[in-house]
Regions:
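Short, well-structured alpha-helical interface segments that form or flank functional binding sites
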Residues: 479-483, 490, 598
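C-terminal beta-signal and adjacent terminal beta-strands/loops
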Residues: 240, 327, 389, 457, ...
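Conserved small-residue
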Residues: 348, 358, 367-478, 509, ...
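Extracytoplasmic assembly/pore-lining segments of large envelope/extracellular complexes
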Residues: 92-93
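Short linear motifs in exposed loops
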Residues: 33, 463-464, 500
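Extracellular/periplasmic, surface-exposed regions of secreted and cell-surface proteins
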Residues: 1-16, 20-24, 28-88, 99-416, ...
Length: 667
């Protein structure tokens, strides 16, 4: 809402005080934070999002030598167009009886985006089998391109809110446009050999070029190889219960180009200066940032061993993979440069990363005779884990604000909390923690957080290096561990049910979040009931008790609370936007971000054949489906646990619960 000068985002609800009312007795919107926000959302304008997508795929196949050699081609074109239209209107606020005023501004904002994506694949495939030998191979060419165009225009002071048009406005106009795009071009090949259905060898190779890298460093070759051995086909393997027993191993390299489209080109931005020349703010151009000559593909080399087992007539399947993945030349900010340089470090192939992990999948499928009909059912469980560590980076001092050798990806450095201060004497005799005071101006008092002096120097400090971390240490890790998924399904007499659960078994999360801290962070933030569990040193006096409402007393707010979740009620005490206590993670408020979510449930029914055949149809299925139905997590009251990304705050709109009713008809 920057055009209208108002704030009407969903985020603003978090800042509302619980005492802010939204409507006056006469039904008009109140002149309060809640009233103005509600008026903006209901009367302050319209937003239309129009989205059109077109996609087509052409395929061509020619069997040059039937059952031996074929030529294939496919081309896909996808075009997406998106139009955003914002029309901002004034809204009415009741200041008193018969005193209704219009507030806000009028504005029109038009935003147009076009996406075009194209991919072309040309390849020849060869298949040949004789006696116990089977050969197959592919050689081909691949080309992809993506183009994005954007143009937006805005203008203020619309003459009539009933005619929201750019040409019917008197205010200042702001227009901008942008373009970005990328392209990939390469050749690829694969050769596969199988002997007696028990020895498997495969070789792969790609030679790819990306427009995201400089011309001289645009192409890279990425080979791989894999082996497989079906032990169950060997004469010495005689285990009736095991239908398949297969060992696998692979080694290969892939290229990663997940960087900005033109990151290798020095770019300059334009802006209007804050001073006037001839009554105009002059246009200025910023100095270009630095780019590095060491800027090309990340090379990701993977080593994998695996095991596949099938039991009970292949009803029960088990898959296990163990892998090590080395990323060489990871594209990230390079070595820290002197601050007097006046610009930040450029992205370059500056770091190496090693990831070790494993994946397990168990699948069971069967059908039984139940009440004279077949009941089929299945279950699948997947579980995976991985940890990543920096193995190379030019940071000899091991500064904590950059990668360093031995750093675990996602590690959280923080302070240790030693309870709350319980007396002024304890404050006086404790280590100096003034550097942790937000804004340097909020007094430490009874009920304030007490930090532990880990290094014993008598001062609570945040260090800067691994060797000198001050009173900080690694207290957790924000990376997701033990990702799991559970699929269940069954079919019986035309009914089918599928459900899916997913989750994360371990993840740490520090709440840099307004909902968690509320008025403990900033005095104008909103309040929630969990925030009332703050430190209170003693019961209120009888005189103070007599002035409290019964509700206040019943909630325990007049009683001592020394074993509280939050510190003493003190504005700015836990401000996360400063160098102080709130902005530095600590172990007391480190939360468990593991979760289990009921992701999907679908119940369907296929109409009997005699009914649909009489209608000239081949199949009719009706279904009811729900998504994001329920979740179990310690943090679900403040953020959506699935929306929490690595080192992210999770301060986004949560995943919505969706319900749908539909019908599938086949003719």
């Amino acid at each position: 809402s920057y055009l209208s000068g108002e704030s009407s985002s969903m985020q603003s609800f978090y800042l509302l005080a619980p005492t802010s009312w939204h409507k006056n007795p006469d039904g008009t919107w109140a002149n309060s934070a809640a009233g103005q926000l509600a008026a903006q959302l209901t009367e302050g304008g319209d937003f239309v999002d129009e989205y059109n997508k077109f996609q087509t795929t052409f395929t061509l196949r020619s069997d040059i030598i039937p059952s031996l050699l074929s030529l294939n081609a496919d081309y896909t074109f996808r075009s997406e167009k998106r139009n955003y239209d914002w029309d901002y209107k004034k809204y009415r606020i009741g200041y008193g009886p018969n005193d209704v005023r219009e507030l806000g501004n009028t504005a029109v904002y038009r935003y147009r985006m076009d996406y075009d994506y194209q991919v072309l694949n040309l390849y020849a495939s060869l298949n040949k089998q004789f006696q116990n030998h089977q050969f197959s191979g592919i050689i081909g060419y691949n080309q992809e391109s993506y183009d994005f165009y954007r143009v937006n225009t805005s203008i203020t002071d619309v003459i009539s809110s009933s005619l929201p048009s750019i040409s019917l406005a008197l205010g200042s106009t702001n227009t901008s446009d942008s373009y970005t795009g990328w392209a990939v071009q390469g050749v690829f090949g694969r050769l596969n050999y199988i002997f007696k259905d028990k020895y498997i060898v495969e070789f792969n190779g790609r030679y790819d070029g990306s427009s995201r890298f400089p011309e001289n460093d645009r192409f890279g070759f990425f080979p791989s190889a894999s082996l497989g051995w079906r032990l169950d086909q060997e004469s010495f393997f005689n285990v009736d219960a095991i239908n398949v027993f297969k060992l696998r191993a692979s080694y290969g390299t892939l290229g990663n180009q997940s960087v900005s489209d033109f990151g290798y080109i020095p770019s300059m931005s334009t802006y209007n200066n804050g001073y006037l020349v001839d009554n105009n703010r002059p246009l200025s151009i910023s100095a270009p940032g630095m780019v590095s000559s060491n800027y090309t593909w990340e090379e990701v080399t993977s080593q994998n061993i695996g095991l596949d087992i099938e039991l009970l007539e292949s009803k029960l399947q088990f898959n296990l993979d163990l892998y090590t993945r080395d990323t060489e030349g990871m594209l990230t900010l390079g070595k820290e440069l002197p601050s007097v340089l006046g610009t930040s470090e450029p992205n370059e192939n500056a770091a190496d990363l090693r990831t070790k992990g494993w994946e397990v999948a168990v699948n069971y499928r069967d059908n039984v005779n139940f009440l004279n009909d077949r009941l089929s059912f299945g279950a699948r469980l997947t579980l995976a884990d991985a940890q990543s560590e920096i193995t190379s980076f030019d940071n000899p001092n091991q500064n904590l604000n950059q990668y360093y050798v031995g750093a675990q990806i996602g590690e959280i450095w923080g302070l240790t909390v030693d309870g709350f201060f319980e007396s002024e004497e304890e404050i006086t005799n404790s280590p100096d923690q003034s550097s942790m005071v937000p804004w340097g101006a909020i007094p430490t008092t009874v009920g304030s957080i007490k930090f532990a002096d880990i290094n014993g120097d008598g001062v609570i400090t945040k260090g800067t290096t691994v060797a000198d971390p001050g009173d900080m240490k690694v207290i957790g890790n924000s990376e997701a561990r033990y990702r799991f998924g559970i699929n269940l399904d069954f079919n019986y007499k035309g009914f089918d049910v599928q459900t899916f659960f997913q989750g994360i078994g371990k993840r740490d999360y520090y709440p840099f979040h307004y909902v968690f801290w509320g008025f403990h962070q900033q005095p104008y933030n909103g309040g929630f009931t969990h925030l009332l569990d703050y430190y209170r040193a003693a019961d209120d006096s009888p005189e103070a008790m007599s002035q409290h409402s019964q509700k206040y007393i019943d909630m325990g707010l007049a009683n001592a609370n020394t074993d509280s979740r939050y510190p003493v009620l003190q504005a700015w005490n836990m401000d996360v936007n400063t160098y102080g206590a709130g902005s530095t993670p600590n172990d007391k408020y480190l939360l468990d971000a593991s979760y289990l979510r009921w992701k999907n449930l679908t119940i369907g029914y296929r109409l009997p054949g005699e009914i649909i055949q009489s209608l000239g149809l081949s199949q009719v299925r009706v279904y009811l489906s729900g998504e994001n139905l329920m979740e179990w997590s310690e943090i679900s009251d403040i953020v959506d646990p699935e929306a929490v990304t690595n080192n992210g705050r999770g301060y986004v709109y949560p995943f919505q619960r969706r319900y749908s009713l539909g019908i599938n008809v086949q003719f």
